[in-house]
Amino acid sequence: MASSRILITSALPYANGPLHFGHITGAYLPADVYARFQRLLGKEVLYICGSDEYGIAITLNAELAGMGYQEYVDMYHKLHKDTLKKLGISVDFFSRTTNPHHPAIVQDFYRNLQDKGLMENLVTDQLYSEEEEKFLADRYVVGTCPKCGFDRARGDECQQCGADYEARDLKDPRSKLTGKALSLRETEHAYFHLERMKEELLTFVEGIYLRPHMRNFVIDYIKNLRPRAVTRDLSWGVPVPGLENKVFYVWFDAPIGYISGTMDWAASIGDPDAWKKFWLDDKVTYTQFVGKDNTSFHSVIFPAMEMGQSLPYKKVDALVTSEFLLLEGFQFSKSEGNIIDMDAFLETYSLDKLRYVLAAIAPETSDSEFAFQEFKTRCNSDLVGKFGNFVNRVVAFAAKNGCTELSHPQLEQQDLEFIAEAQKLAKEAADHYQQYSLRKACSTIMELAALGNGYFNDQAPWKLAKEDLWNRVRSILFCACYCQKLLALISYPIMPETAWTIWGMIAPGSLDLRSQDPERLQSIWTEAFFDYSEESFSLKEPELLFTVVE
């Protein structure tokens, strides 16, 4: 039996820059669509997200910007929260890894892993700056790549040849901040023995949902596990118990932010223990949405961390990954100028246009591309030509002919067949949402709009009106409005504003919009909603849903 309680998380956005369309399509729009759909089904949904606020990239860029670390992450936390709100991402609580609950639970995770014999302190050689009097983590280091000889290679990866390595392997390493040469010194770090958990992890991933093309990647990753450092020589982060001047590596503390973020939510509603009903109850269904570059952390490392705890933390049931979204064939990059100003875009084009196109091109199993020409084509062909045209022509015809109150139609066989086909497509859309396919859901939405348009054309009520066959005209309009009611229903997870507008125009008697939150429609997707026998419609003046993109 499916769980009535649904926990949803999407990858915590790193507080080191603005969000772009690639981020939105990869983790936040898919999670929002799924959350909205599950609420329609009447599930108790909790969608948690928040800023990932520790790590080297943050400290380095804050220093380069002349800002304090907290000041820097505060800036991006607010920006991310505002961006998600503008995009209609219905996150229930947007927390941050600097929340007051986070340090204690991260340290508790670490101690439990120590108690299980899965942590070990090892002494290794690390790069040290005599001038700055501290060890430098990889992003603070530049030098000559040991593979290709590129002389401005980063401390963890060469931008020229793509090689990855330890910072100490660089030739002529120097500080990124001062340019001074670095030396090697011994330092102690804690290592997580992931390789000791291979069999347990292989069994675990057999039982969770992964996109088929990702499963082999995850299995290979598990088979090649090795000890992994969980600590760094930084001042910004969660302090490590028993190791002076060390903080936890961001990959270790960040996923625990899903739990501490839920604690933060529980505190905000005045029920500090409310987090437990989502994280300590195995009957909950837990779905995570991440980009493909986060797959290993969420499919293997975070579950391994949870397995080593004394509390039975809920592990992921479905890990929904996305490939990369490219911009005109290239990766989104602020430094390269390959970016779209999201605020400016939304000032020009409606939110639902953007949400629909991003959903229709979602990089679910392979990289996809955002190109303005395709955006224009999909808006004008799909949203204006098919979807908007169907809704507008029906409501406008009804208003023009005074047929605004519709109920108890006299249905013919062709009407019943049309209604049955509309119901079938609506249920197909539900399957696509359950299977995390935004692309297929978009296709089905357009199929239903095309079905409605075809029915209205075939029945040609304007001809019947000339013959004064008004009962038949009203029956056709009733069926068309019923189709629009379902069209709004299956569109709502992707285009919530548009769905709300359609329902407002046709005013189904079965739907009391006054009692609903537009952002969190609850318990609408029911058998009663699909029943047409007692339905009625009270049509209002038509509103233009979409305008042509020039």
Curated annotation (Swiss-Prot):
A motif ('HIGH' region) lies at residues 13-23. The keyword Cytoplasm applies. It is found in: Cytoplasm. Signal peptide: none annotated. ATP binds at residue 334. The keyword Iron-sulfur does not apply. InterPro entries: Anticodon_Met, Met-tRNA_ligase_1, Met-tRNA_synth, Methionyl/Leucyl_tRNA_Synth, MetRS_core, MetRS_Zn, Rossmann-like_a/b/a_fold, tRNAsynth_Ia_anticodon-bd. Keywords: Aminoacyl-tRNA synthetase, ATP-binding, Cytoplasm, Ligase, Metal-binding, Nucleotide-binding, Protein biosynthesis, Zinc. Zn(2+) binds at residues 145, 148, 158, 161. SUPFAM superfamilies: Anticodon-binding domain of a subclass of class I aminoacyl-tRNA synthetases, Methionyl-tRNA synthetase (MetRS), Zn-domain, Nucleotidylyl transferase. A motif ('KMSKS' region) lies at residues 331-335. One of its GO terms (biological process) is methionyl-tRNA aminoacylation. Binds 1 zinc ion per subunit. Its EC number is 6.1.1.10. NCBIfam families: metG. Belongs to the class-I aminoacyl-tRNA synthetase family. MetG type 1 subfamily. Monomer. This is Methionine--tRNA ligase.
